[in-house]
């Protein structure tokens, strides 16, 4: 296979270091994952270069965050496929990688009934937009 050079960016993330730092505070405050994440872990997540995987506590809350980031063009609209294709996140119960279908269902649910903790995400998204 041909060696591809340059930086791959499947999420097409426009997030800067200070914005990722803010998002790190957000996901930790919202207890999004089963572990506390560092700025480096979140940076690696958005670069699809995680040394391991994250395990989600609440898939709907994750979907809500990613949906918001996508709405404001911080990441691509196809974020669900990026998570599935790169096997970045495991389901809490079965410990299997989240699929696009799981994320699509969670996104639909989050649009109808805001998930517990959504106000934490809204607060940080507002801060992101202020710069």
Residue ranges of predicted features:
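Flexible coil/loop and intrinsically disordered linker positions at secondary-structure junctions
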Residues: 1-131
């Amino acid at each position: 296979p041909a060696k591809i050079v340059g930086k791959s960016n499947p999420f097409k993330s426009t997030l800067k270091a200070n914005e990722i730092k803010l998002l790190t505070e957000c996901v930790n405050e919202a207890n999004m994952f089963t572990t506390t994440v560092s700025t480096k872990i979140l940076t690696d997540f958005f670069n699809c270069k995680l040394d391991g995987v994250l395990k989600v506590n609440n898939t709907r809350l994750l979907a809500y965050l990613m949906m918001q980031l996508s709405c404001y063009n911080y990441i691509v609209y196809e974020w669900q496929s990026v998570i599935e294709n790169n096997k970045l996140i495991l389901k809490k119960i079965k410990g299997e990688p989240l699929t696009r279908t799981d994320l699509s269902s969670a996104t639909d649910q989050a649009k109808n009934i805001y998930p517990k903790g959504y106000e934490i995400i809204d607060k940080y998204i507002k801060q992101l937009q202020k710069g």
